[in-house]
Amino acid sequence: MYQFIHTIFDDYKVQSDELHNLLVDFYRQLNVTALIRNKLNCTIKENTRRTAGFHTDNELDALTAIFHLNTNNGKTIFESGEGYESKANRLITFPSKLRHSGMVCTDVNRRMVMNVNFY
């Protein structure tokens, strides 16, 4: 799996001023009181669909929001078997401690999501 990452906020500071400023209203709509991390993930198309591997974003009592930026046949899935197809403008919010995985796409050149960890 090949993935490009652009970090917007991490390590208690803004890493990408321009993008961070564009997202102020988005953070407000999520009711963010404190950011932990925000990053853009771009996963490259593969010939077969597979998961990237189950993981937690952190062990804090925080929330994760995954915002799907484009429509493709990839998914966000959970160990429970529950899954959400990658549809542009779809937002999934869940506890950051919940194990989840992305699934690569095979139908378009890339799967793009924004991953926000916050209180």
Which sequence ranges carry the predicted segments?
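Non-heme Fe(II)/2-oxoglutarate
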Residues: 1-33, 46
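A short hydrophobic beta-strand segment most commonly corresponding to one strand
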Residues: 65-67, 108-119
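A short beta-strand-loop-beta hairpin characteristic of the jelly-roll/cupin
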Residues: 48-53, 60-62, 68-87
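Conserved metal-binding segment of the jelly-roll/cupin
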Residues: 45, 84-101
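Short beta-strand His + acidic residue motifs that chelate non-heme Fe in jelly-roll/DSBH
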Residues: 53-54, 99-107
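Short beta-strand segments enriched in hydrophobic/aromatic residues
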Residues: 42-44, 69, 118
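Long amphipathic N-terminal alpha/beta scaffold segment
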Residues: 33-35, 40
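Residue-level preference for beta-strand/loop junctions
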Residues: 32, 61, 108-110
